[in-house]
């Protein structure tokens, strides 16, 4: 799958790289994703990673996940990635990654069905103009459509460099507009200390994308000290996917893409 990157008028003199989204099929593909994750999480954001000496971000769950990659078509460089853990593979792993941060017992009836967890989402700085995350959502939407996924969930991370001011503001907004029903809320295993909310909400792009799709914030955030972030648990009932985004990412994209480009996701 390929899509042109759209630049502002002042950037039109620059070549416009094309992007494609695909599932990793080789160990080298997965390694490229782990290298990008290291560059973003450790070098850019200062996360403390157990695998940092190897120059990658790798953990136990990687071996059980599908890895979705966004590549430049000219250089084949991986510029975006996320990983997908399906319910059957979570059973093989012994748990979902989110269970290391949240008590998910209220969600177990939903997660016994066809659910996916996404995580470790990152985009190269040069592609944070919407193109990189857009391609990831395109791939995720097609994966969900082809595998008949009912629920998608994962964590959206908020930096704690400000002592929790921004996450406090975001949660105040979420409690008013996006909070999941009580029966679908999770409990954090490590609570945040109270913080004075920031004067202005600065919604991270990933969280903003989740909420535009119609996702819920499913409870209070969890502190992740290794990454120095607060993780907000997000739950999306795919059957309630925002109609406009479903039409754009799923119906429209599947109709326009050649069969050869769609088959890679279907085979996962």
Q: Which sequence ranges carry the predicted segments?
A:
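Long, contiguous binding/interaction regions
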Residues: 240-242, 246-249
């Amino acid at each position: 799958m390929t899509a042109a990157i759209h630049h502002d008028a002042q950037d039109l003199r620059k070549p416009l790289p094309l992007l494609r989204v695909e599932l990793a099929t080789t160990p080298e593909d997965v390694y490229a994703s782990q290298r990008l994750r290291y560059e973003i999480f450790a070098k850019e954001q200062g996360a403390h990673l157990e695998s940092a000496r190897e120059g990658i971000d790798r953990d136990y769950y990687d071996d059980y996940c599908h890895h979705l990659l966004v590549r430049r078509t000219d250089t084949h460089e991986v510029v975006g990635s996320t990983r997908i853990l399906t319910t059957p593979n979570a059973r093989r792993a012994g748990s979902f990654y989110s269970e290391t941060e949240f008590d998910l017992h209220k969600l177990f009836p939903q997660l016994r069905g066809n659910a996916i967890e996404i995580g470790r989402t990152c985009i190269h700085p040069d592609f944070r103009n919407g193109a990189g995350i857009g391609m990831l959502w395109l791939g995720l939407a097609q994966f969900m459509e082809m595998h008949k996924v009912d629920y998608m969930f994962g964590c959206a991370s908020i930096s704690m460099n400000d002592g929790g001011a921004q996450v406090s503001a975001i949660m105040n907004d979420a409690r008013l507009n996006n909070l999941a029903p009580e029966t679908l809320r999770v409990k954090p295993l490590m609570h945040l200390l109270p913080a004075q909310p920031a004067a202005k909400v600065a919604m991270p792009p990933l969280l903003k994308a989740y909420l535009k799709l119609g996702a819920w914030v499913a409870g209070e955030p969890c502190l992740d000290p290794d990454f120095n972030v607060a993780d907000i648990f997000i739950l999306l009932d795919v059957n309630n996917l925002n109609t406009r985004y479903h039409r754009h990412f799923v119906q429209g994209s599947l109709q326009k893409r050649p069969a050869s480009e769609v088959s890679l996701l279907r085979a996962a």
